[in-house]
Every structure is written in C-alpha cells, then in structure tokens.
Regions:
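ATP-dependent phospho-/nucleotidyl transfer catalytic cores
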Residues: 1, 66-69
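Active-site acidic catalytic loop and adjacent metal/ATP-binding pocket
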Residues: 1-33
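Conserved short-loop catalytic and cofactor-binding motifs
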Residues: 23, 40, 67
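Active-site activation/catalytic loop segments of kinase-like enzymes and analogous catalytic loops
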Residues: 32-62, 73-89
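Exposed alpha-helical structural elements
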Residues: 48-51, 66, 93, 97
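ATP/Mg2+ or Mg2+-diphosphate-binding catalytic cores
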Residues: 81-113
Length: 113
C-alpha cells in the first residue's frame, strides 16, 4: 500500500509523532514510487536525499537504477498534472510546479551514495 501523494502538506507534526493525511490517492503501488515522489515533491537536494535514503534503507540496499526510473517518472507525472491544471484553471501555482518539474526532467538528478 502506498500513499502516492507525499507532499509537505500531507504531513502533520506533533511533539512526539508524524502523521500522514489525505489518502485520496492511496492504493497498491511499488514503494519506490512513494520514495521517489517524496524526493521529487519535496524538492530534496542531494544531501537531503542521501540523508533520507540512509534513514529509509536500514535493512536492505537501495536499488538506485529503479529509484532513478521512478524519479524521472514522478517528475513527468507531476509535470503533466501541473500542465493540465494550469491550462484548465490558470492558477500560477501550477505554472510554478510545471516549471520546476520541467527543469528536473531537463537536468535529471543522479542519486548515489
């Protein structure tokens, strides 16, 4: 089961816990999608990505080739989503997202540690 929308606004932080909300896109998926989506949607830089991956993959090794494919897929997915919504609604937030994702697609990140 994957959340499929791990954006900053879907995390609630309390003094002792972190909660995920907004499960409208949740469903069966490869967990690498959630990992890649978290990196992509939160625009993690290289060091933040390395820190996140080291914390996540404590019992197994990260498949970097698979992660790279999912990172590109997430950028393409959210670029397409933002393009459609910007065209339909004309809200600047969607234009900002599509520009960010376009730049990520144009200059893909390489993850290795």
């Amino acid at each position: 089961m994957c959340h499929n929308d791990l954006v900053e606004g879907n995390f609630l932080f309390t003094k002792n816990n972190i909660f995920l909300i907004d499960y409208e896109y949740a469903g069966l998926n490869d967990y690498y999608f959630d990992i890649a989506s978290f990196i992509s949607e939160n625009n993690l830089d290289y060091q933040e990505t390395v820190t996140f991956l080291k914390a996540y993959f404590t019992d197994e090794e990260c498949d970097f080739k698979k992660l790279d494919v999912f990172l590109r897929f997430c950028d393409l997915l959210w670029y397409t989503w933002a393009s459609l919504l910007y065209e339909k609604r004309g809200e600047e937030v969607y234009n900002e997202i599509l520009i960010t994702k376009y730049n990520s697609l144009k200059n893909p990140r390489s993850i290795a540690y």
